[in-house]
Amino acid sequence: MPKIGIIGGSGVYGVFEPKEVVKIHTPYGRPSAPVEIGEIEGVEVAFIPRHGKYHEFPPHEVPYRANIWALYELGVERIIAINAVGSLKEEYKPGDIVIIDQFIDFTKKREYTFYNGPKVAHVSMADPFCPELRRIFIETAKELGLPVHEKGTYICIEGPRFSTRAESRMFRQFADVIGMTLVPEVNLARELGMCYVNISTVTDYDVWAEKPVNAQEVLRVMKENEEKVQKLLRKAIPKIPEERKCGCADVLKTMFV
């Protein structure tokens, strides 16, 4: 079974052709869609469309626990997560790729843990993302000449609404990009000792910029971003070693009370 899982949108189908569909019912319900298994450049991967096959789940209703558990149950050890984000800083331009290294949780009512009792866990999130996967994707993006930021802080809001201008100006003080789907995905993966890397693609500037958003321009950038991510996945995934040496699974030794 695949050791690598991808959670993202329909753009993944540009590099991935499903060969098998696995329906899984987890202790947390059904995932966003049946897990699709196929190959990217000869490497077996499992894919879940985060928002559902037909984009039926808004960000605050995505079954995050079921998605992560389904991949875990299949034997996946590493998760590559792909997100579209808005920019909070001038230097993070539309069309850029950000390999996120930190996040701030501004969500409100999601299911954040697998351990609601009687077993209790406090997982370390000081460094939330797999250093080995981050290195591979940063180096590969540079090799391909893609516009990549090696670091970035992602603030995750509840959604589904976008920010007010006042909120956006506040968020600019402590984050670089803004989105709605990183949390609780990243901490759930950590609770199961899974590696997790986030590839965020910038679609536009958030409303702090006070520039009118051109829908056609956003759609154009999103299409270009899909193509960049497809190139990145094709080139980076074959570089991921069989054996993990990152220490992501070590959190399991210290997180239980």
UniProtKB/Swiss-Prot annotation:
Its EC number is 2.4.2.28. Pfam families: PNP_UDP_1. GO terms for molecular function: S-methyl-5-thioadenosine phosphorylase activity. One of its GO terms (biological process) is L-methionine salvage from methylthioadenosine. The record marks 163, 215 as: Important for substrate specificity. InterPro entries: MTAP (IPR010044), Nucleoside_phosphorylase_d (IPR000845), Nucleoside_phosphorylase_sf (IPR035994), Purine_phosphorylase-2_CS (IPR018099). It catalyses: S-methyl-5'-thioadenosine + phosphate = 5-(methylsulfanyl)-alpha-D-ribose 1-phosphate + adenine. It comes from the Archaea. The keyword Transferase applies. Phosphate binds at residues 10, 50-51, 181. Substrate binds at residues 180, 204-206. One of its GO terms (cellular component) is cytosol. SUPFAM superfamilies: Purine and uridine phosphorylases. Pathway: Amino-acid biosynthesis; L-methionine biosynthesis via salvage pathway; S-methyl-5-thio-alpha-D-ribose 1-phosphate from S-methyl-5'-thioadenosine (phosphorylase route): step 1/1. The keyword Transmembrane does not apply. Keywords: Glycosyltransferase, Purine salvage, Transferase. Signal peptide: none annotated. Catalyzes the reversible phosphorylation of S-methyl-5'-thioadenosine (MTA) to adenine and 5-methylthioribose-1-phosphate. Involved in the breakdown of MTA, a major by-product of polyamine biosynthesis. Responsible for the first step in the methionine salvage pathway after MTA has been generated from S-adenosylmethionine. Has broad substrate specificity with 6-aminopurine nucleosides as preferred substrates. Homohexamer. Dimer of a homotrimer. Belongs to the PNP/MTAP phosphorylase family. MTAP subfamily. This is S-methyl-5'-thioadenosine phosphorylase. It comes from Pyrococcus abyssi (strain GE5 / Orsay).
